[in-house]
């Protein structure tokens, strides 16, 4: 008897997930493999996937359009949380995994599968994200992980696939592993594994090389309501269109490239190249608007919790209790994050040059001004400073006495 009867495999069309199809059937005795590929805004990349999975031995090849929930339910909460893993990476890949896992479980229920599978290796982050999410959503489903167990090198995996009639998609000329969705691209492997090797221009697709960016700066305005971006330059956009337009604007100016050494969940460091033009632009604008509309103590607390929120998502704990609790905090803070941020885009940089809110601004010109309209009570400062500095004076006096 095989490890499962009917399996739904999370399918990308890459080497590992393609080889998983014959491997599950031939090596693990799975009777039927159904593949599911998520359309997350990859574009034309998904067109050949259906037939490729069928050619590899899948009984059904399903593709699901998840673009709208991806942006509304995953990307927008990340913008509201200013989610930047290790202060830099806006989680463009990590945000997709809990959504794929959720839909994978739903498909398994619909087709009566007794297991799900993925093609993640044993040293990556995605295996953690998929396994933990599936365990939270459907603890009764088996999770099969052939790529984690088969012990084959990448070359051996490609050779196994070729014996099963699966062509190798990666050539020596292009040795990179690329993950793509509407939020961005992640590029790794090949010569990029040497952290001293500069990424060649050929690995980028969403951002213009600096030599091709406009020589004139472009100023734009992004409007937010309840923490969500809703308009660019006065044009109201739905969430998906918002990301597309932000990608276009930022990418055309070469904004959104990241080259970083990243600490993976499994404990190793990896070199990652990311392109996330629109998401980084929107997070930057959102942060700036919060500085205008949130009280100081709320803002300080939120900045600390943002790091924890990003860590939880990166570590595959989207469906965990702490993430759920932090969502409540984030949502509550966003009620008054309404307004407009003006940015100047130029040669790889987005610079905030203005911000305003007619509804929620806590910036009071009469209090901030040093001119004749100054309404701040300067006389009150003396008493405030006396009380504020009292602990310091008492401590200093005790040091003089003991010394």
From Swiss-Prot:
A molecular function (GO) term: argininosuccinate synthase activity
Binding site for L-aspartate: 121, 125-126
Compartments where located: Cytoplasm
Residues the record lists as binding ATP: 10-18, 38, 119
Keyword Transferase: no
Assembly: Homotetramer.
Protein name, UniProt field: Argininosuccinate synthase
Gene source species: Parasynechococcus marenigrum (strain WH8102)
